[in-house]
Each structure stands twice: as structure tokens, then as C-alpha cells.
């Protein structure tokens, strides 16, 4: 379980100052190129060493550098651009996997644009106050007391991993005459699941020396990409159950249809599909006749996701989503059915498998799933038990461990259902009776612990 802290006044003051300072630094870094910082550093050094006006060479060099910087800055500020852009985006992406797309840009102005670039402004990487107060940089406990108190390295670490997506640089150099269009390729890496919004494509207008650049917005529509959760590699799964065949259609099964071979003809029974009617035999006998097939029966599994954030927090919830997505992508749904169960605004069940829906549908649902910090486990417990008799076994993914969750798991086990329990937690697994047979997955070592869970 992750201990939730509200933080003291000093920590909240640090957060506000780091956040404001980061915004200011980001503004200048977009407009001042590294070469300009180098020139300004050399200029300052030459001023210090050239304090003696008799050293005419140093003075001349200082004035030259100052002049170049001034010309470059004024040039960049005076550049203008009228550009319209249209993105050609893929429907989906995946967390942690590079994604590329094309943008058609048009210079709607009369003046030609030379040596320009295009860049999608990345998502704000700054952490929330909750993240700054409650998440620790790996190895933070080994730092000295000064670094721990100021939490600068924690802020830096959170920024490196923050934001929903990260831009991978700018486009190639373009030269656009008035009214001309060209297609450019841009890349990014999604860092969080959900709907990725692209709404700030900028054209960069540098000065001739490459010291400064002006960043102007383009006329563009908002683009969206659905980012599915990160998926981890799982060891071989043995959840029990296998598909089998049953002759006839009298016994109810999970999936009915022409999955098996044709067996023969029989008389019509109420409920038989019109698609199975044998019209020639009906015309010959005068009685409705239907074709009979072997009925394929598939095992049905439950995948129960804990969306309760109490005592855990968003980080553990995100890893629980990824673990659930890993199970969805790993199961052979041509040979089974999979019920995804969780509680959002209300108890929900989504089924994928042969004859129902594809796994992609469950991935989209997981990409949009939200956590909540209200309510207990009564609704989820009732939902799972309602389908217990239909399920071969059930995979339960929890976002922490406490008394409420222990009672929930105990209720499922008492029903006679075979439960495969995965608990996303912090630190080592507590020695508790309710966790016997469970797979404890540390939120910061998910892949390693999943491979040990075989």
C-alpha cells in the first residue's frame, strides 16, 4: 500500500516554485538555441577578461558577439508566417512505442518562407502536486539530507517521466513559397494511456545565425489518438479449461453456432436459427427440417480490475491497467471467452472472444478506464458472483492490499471459483494469510515480478 501524504507548507512552496521556474525555463528553451547560450557565455567571459580597454582585440571581439546576438534576436522577432496544417493521424498508438504521422503544411501567405521547421509542442511534463508529494525518486533515500529536503532530483525525475506524450524533435528543413504545400513527418512517444490530444503545432522561424527562433502557432484542427495501455510479457498461462465439442443444441453453451462439423438433419425445434433450415428437405417432407452441427463449447474466463484508488493512488492503478491489458493481449480468444469486469460509474462487463468481439475492443475500454476513490467492493463483488457459475476461472488484479480487498477476495474464493490473484503493491509482499498463493507485483518492477509469477 502507498502511504498518501499531504505535505507540509515548505514542500508545497517548493512545488509551486519548481512549477513556475520550469514554465519559464521551457519558454526560453523553445526560443533560444544552444548556440546562443554558448555565444552569451563567451561574450560574458570576454567582457570579464576585457575589462582593460587597452586590450582592443578582446573589446572588438566582445562587441562583435554582442552585435551578432542583437541582430539575430531582432531578425527572429520580425519573422512572420501564415501557415495552415492538416494532420494525418493513426487511430491508435501504444504506450512506450514510437508513433509517426504526417502533416500537410501550406503557406497561405504571399511571402516565401525559408529555412523553417515544424514541431508539435509536447504535453506538459510537470507532475501534479499529489505526485510531487507522494512519489519518490528511486534511490532518494541514499541522497544527502540537503537533496532530500529540497527534492530537486525528485522533481527532475518526475519531469522526465511526466506528460502524456513526448515529441521526438522537429521536422526537416522546409522552404515554402507563397501558396505552396508540402508533407512533413513528425514523431512522438506516448507515455500515458488514454486520448492523446494534439492541438499545438508550431512553425519555428530561426534567424540566419541559428541563435534565436520565433515559435508561431499554425492554423490546425485538434487531432486525437487513442493510446492503449502498455503491455508486459507474461509467462505461459494455465488458467484451466479447454474447448470441446458437443453434438446437438439442447445443452446451453457459451458460444453456439456452426463451429463444429455438419452432423445431419433433424426436425425443427423452437429457437432454431432460420439460417440452419434445410429448404429442400422441407419441400420434400412438408415438415420444417434443420441442419445439425457439432456445438463448440469454449472456456470462459473473468478478468476483474480493481479501480479503487483509496490506499493506492494513480501510479498503482496505471500499472494494474497495464497488467490487465497484458492478459487481454496474451489470451487466445479464438479458443475462449474473456469477460472484463470493473466498476466505473456503474458495474460493467465487456466480453471478447470467438463470436462476440475482438480483443481490440477491450483494449480501447482499458485505455479509457478511470479510477475512483469512492465506494467499496460490494458492487464489484456482486458483479463477479453473478457470473461465477459461467466462468472457468477468474484473474483478479488489485491496486493494493487492505482489509476491504482481503474481504473481497475471500468472498470470491468462498464461492468455489478458481481465483488467480495479482496484487500491485509497493515494496515487499506482506506476510498475510489472504495473500497465500497470490502474485505480488511491485509497481516499479512489474515486468520482473510478472515473469516470476509462473
Locations of the language-model features?
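Extracellular/lumenal glycan-associated context and N-glycosylation machinery
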Residues: 1-86
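Long hydrophobic alpha-helices with heptad-repeat/coiled-coil character
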Residues: 5-30, 170, 249, 253-289, ...
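Acidic, low-complexity intrinsically disordered regions
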Residues: 9, 33-35, 71, 151-153, ...
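Intrinsically disordered, low-complexity regions
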Residues: 11, 234, 287, 432-433
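Short linear interaction motif-like sites in intrinsically disordered regions of transcription factors
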Residues: 14, 38-40, 131, 280, ...
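An amphipathic, basic-hydrophobic helix/alpha-beta surface used to engage anionic
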Residues: 67-350, 393-397, 411
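Acidic, glycine-rich A-domain
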Residues: 329-454
Amino acid at each position: 500500500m502507498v502511504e498518501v501524504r499531504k505535505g507540509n507548507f515548505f514542500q508545497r512552496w517548493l512545488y509551486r516554485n519548481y512549477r513556475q521556474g520550469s514554465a519559464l525555463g521551457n519558454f526560453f528553451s523553445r526560443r533560444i538555441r544552444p548556440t546562443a547560450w554558448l555565444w552569451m557565455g563567451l561574450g560574458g567571459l570576454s567582457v570579464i577578461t576585457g575589462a582593460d580597454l587597452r586590450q582592443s582585440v578582446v573589446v572588438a571581439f566582445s562587441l562583435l558577439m554582442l552585435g551578432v546576438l542583437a541582430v539575430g534576436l531582432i531578425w527572429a522577432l520580425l519573422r512572420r508566417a501564415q501557415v495552415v496544417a492538416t494532420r494525418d493521424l493513426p487511430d491508435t498508438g501504444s504506450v512506450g512505442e514510437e508513433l509517426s504521422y504526417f502533416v500537410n503544411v501550406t503557406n497561405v501567405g504571399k511571402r516565401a518562407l525559408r529555412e523553417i521547421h515544424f514541431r508539435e509542442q509536447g504535453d506538459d511534463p510537470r507532475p501534479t502536486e499529489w505526485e510531487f508529494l507522494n512519489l519518490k525518486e528511486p534511490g532518494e533515500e541514499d541522497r544527502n539530507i540537503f537533496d532530500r529536503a529540497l527534492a530537486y532530483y525528485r522533481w527532475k525525475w518526475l519531469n522526465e517521466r511526466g506528460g502524456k506524450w513526448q515529441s521526438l524533435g522537429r521536422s526537416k528543413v522546409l522552404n515554402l513559397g507563397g501558396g505552396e504545400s508540402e508533407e512533413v513527418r513528425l514523431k512522438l512517444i506516448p507515455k500515458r494511456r488514454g486520448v492523446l490530444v494534439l492541438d499545438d503545432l508550431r512553425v519555428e522561424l530561426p534567424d540566419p545565425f541559428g541563435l534565436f527562433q520565433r515559435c508561431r502557432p499554425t492554423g490546425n484542427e485538434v487531432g486525437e489518438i487513442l493510446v492503449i495501455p502498455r503491455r508486459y510479457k507474461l509467462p505461459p498461462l494455465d488458467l484451466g479449461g479447454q474447448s470441446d465439442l458437443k453434438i446437438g443444441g439442447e445443452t446451453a453453451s457459451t458460444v453456439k453456432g456452426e463451429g463444429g462439423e455438419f452432423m445431419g438433419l433433424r426436425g425443427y425445434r423452437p429457437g432454431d436459427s432460420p439460417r440452419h433450415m434445410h429448404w429442400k428437405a422441407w419441400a420434400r417432407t412438408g415438415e420444417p427440417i434443420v441442419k445439425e452441427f457439432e456445438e463448440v463449447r469454449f472456456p470462459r474466463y473473468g478478468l476483474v480490475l480493481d479501480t479503487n484508488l483509496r490506499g493506492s493512488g494513480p501510479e498503482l492503478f496505471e500499472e494494474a491497467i497495464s497488467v490487465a491489458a497484458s492478459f487481454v493481449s496474451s489470451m487466445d480468444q479464438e479458443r475462449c471467452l474473456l469477460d472484463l469486469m470493473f466498476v466505473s460509474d456503474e458495474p460493467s462487463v465487456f466480453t471478447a472472444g470467438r463470436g462476440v468481439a475482438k480483443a481490440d475492443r477491450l483494449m480501447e475500454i482499458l485505455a479509457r478506464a478511470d479510477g475512483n476513490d469512492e465506494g467499496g467492493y460490494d458492487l464489484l463483488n456482486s458483479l463477479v458472483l453473478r457470473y461465477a457459475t459461467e466462468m472457468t476461472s477468474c484473474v483478479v488484479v488489485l491496486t493494493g492490499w487492505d482489509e476491504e480487498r482481503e474481504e473481497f477476495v475471500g468472498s470470491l474464493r468462498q464461492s468455489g471459483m478458481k481465483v488467480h490473484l495479482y496484487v500491485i503493491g509497493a515494496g515487499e509482499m506482506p506476510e498475510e494469510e489472504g495473500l497465500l498463493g497470490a502474485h505480488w507485483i511491485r509497481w516499479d518492477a512489474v515486468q520482473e515480478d510478472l515473469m516470476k509469477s509462473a
